[in-house]
Design a protein with these regions (language model features):
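Histidine phosphotransfer helical core of two-component systems
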Residues: 1-35
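Conserved micro-motifs of the catalytic ATP-binding
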Residues: 50-53, 86-89, 155
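A conserved beta-strand-to-alpha-helix junction within the catalytic ATP-binding
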Residues: 54-68
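Short helix N-cap motif at coil->helix boundaries in the Bergerat
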Residues: 60, 139-147
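Short beta-strand/loop element within the Bergerat-fold HATPase_c
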Residues: 115-127
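Short alpha-helical Gxxx[C/S/T] motif in the catalytic ATP-binding
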Residues: 163, 167
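Detector for a conserved hydrophobic position within an alpha-helical segment of the HATPase_c
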Residues: 171-172
Length: 199
């Protein structure tokens, strides 16, 4: 949202003949981002009671990109090989999944580390949409690898994350999968796969 406002400040020209249309486009973008932030706030409001899941037909690319707008870290990149990939999943739950994976990635990178990098990507592969969150943080210790998806398992003493066990359950409820690759000292990549709806 901050980037949207900054971009508008730089580009706004009151003498532009299309100023009304541009104001409308800008307003619609802000409304979308506010709705996304509201969904994120709702997703984080009560971890103990998971709301009933809804089946919504939505554009995964759009939802993931909007969810990433809440993060201010300049080293986070978003990529997609398509502007629209349709799946059936609860919007709030998808935002839960993405924001938690991104938050975990941010926390895995030491504050003092140079050349920080998190790449979030969405692509279509056969009958699935693949969402990957890759970081160049500290990675997962070998002793923790087999416990990552255990309920309530965490390597952090504090934080708002749902835990990967709950994230995994949400994904599996939508016939999806979550996997990861990690190298201790070099980083981790999580991949979420969900079935798509072919148009």
């Amino acid at each position: 949202m901050r980037l949207t406002v900054q971009s508008f400040q730089r580009k706004f020209d009151p003498t532009d003949p299309n100023v009304k249309q541009k104001m409308n486009d800008y307003s619609e973008t802000l409304i979308q981002q506010i709705d996304t932030m509201s969904a994120v706030a709702s997703a984080f409001s009560n971890f103990a009671s998971m709301p009933a899941q809804q089946n919504e037909t939505l554009n995964v690319v759009e939802v993931v990109e909007l969810a990433m707008d809440i993060f201010n870290e300049e080293y986070i990149e978003f990529h997609s090989d398509s502007p629209k990939i349709i799946s059936k999943i609860d919007r709030t739950q998808l935002i839960r999944i993405i924001t938690n994976l991104a938050k975990n990635a941010i926390q895995s990178i030491p504050e003092q580390q140079e050349n920080k990098s998190i790449i979030v990507s969405v692509k279509k592969e056969l009958n699935n949409v693949l969402i990957t969150v890759a970081d160049n943080g500290i990675g997962i210790q070998p002793k923790d690898i087999d416990r990552i998806f255990e309920p309530k398992f965490t390597t952090k003493s504090s934080g708002m994350g749902l835990g990967l066990g709950i994230i995994k359950n949400i994904i599996e409820n939508y016939k999806g999968t979550i996997t990861f690759e990690t190298e201790f000292g070099k980083g981790t990549t999580f991949t979420v796969s969900l079935p798509i709806i072919n148009s």
